[in-house]
Amino acid sequence: MEQFQEKVNELFAKHETLLSRKNIPLEDGNGIFTRYQHPVLTAAHTPIFWRYDLNEKTNPYLMERIGMNATMNSGAIKWNDKYILMVRVEGSDRKSFFAVAESPNGVDNFRFWDYPVTCLLYTSDAADEL
C-alpha cells in the first residue's frame, strides 16, 4: 500500500513539474514569430487520472491503462482572460478524442480540463422537446 502510494505521488509530482515549467523564448528568431524552448502541449500533459487506474486493487503494478500518443490540430481562443486550446488527443491505439486545455498566458502552464469533450446525441424525440 505504502509503496503504491509513493509511486502515485511521484507520478503526480513529475506531472506537476512538467505543467508548471516555464517556457523560455529562444533567442534566434526571425523577428516575426517568437519560438519557445518547449512545445506548449504534449501527450505528457494529459492528466494522470486519464492514463492510469489509480486504484491499487484493480491496478496493483500501476501500469498505464490508456496510453496517449500525441496532441495536435489545436484551435485556440482567448476566453475569460485565459488561453483555451481545443485539442485533438490521440491515444496509443490511434483513436482520437477532443479535449480542452487552458493557460493563463498561452505559452506555458497549460492544463487539461478534467474531462474530454463529449457530444450530446439528440434523437428525434429529444429534438421535439427542445
PLM features: residue spans?
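Short, solvent-exposed loop/turn segments at secondary-structure junctions
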Residues: 46-47, 90-93
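Hydrophobic core segments of beta-strands in well-ordered, beta-rich domains
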Residues: 74-91
